[in-house]
Amino acid sequence: MNENNLQTKKLVNFGPSGRAVAQPIDKSLLDNIFEHLTMERYANVQYFSMYLWFQERDLNGFASHFLSESQGEMEHAQKFADYLIARGQSVKLDEIPAPVQTWDSIEELISYSFNMEASILKE
């Protein structure tokens, strides 16, 4: 019985976190997941910045919308992180740039938001 346990252990791969995984994640896929995780985190911070801009101007409907968008992006990032952990992978958090915080008008902010989302969808 001990011999069977030893043979089974040899068939199991372990990820960097020490958790057993069925199959290691391909490096290029892992790099893409980390890149997407970083994009989700940046979008979270950027949408939060937009929320603050509207909140400071008592534009509560817009503020509520962008707060919801910010929370949604954080949930997306969390799902990617949870997936990596479930696969036995340590999560690497890359640095994200500071968000834009000033706009001259509502139209400029909405346009910025649209262009940011469009660029994320391209990648």
What is the predicted role of each segment?
Residues 1-123:
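Iron-associated oxidoreductase/ferritin-like identity signal
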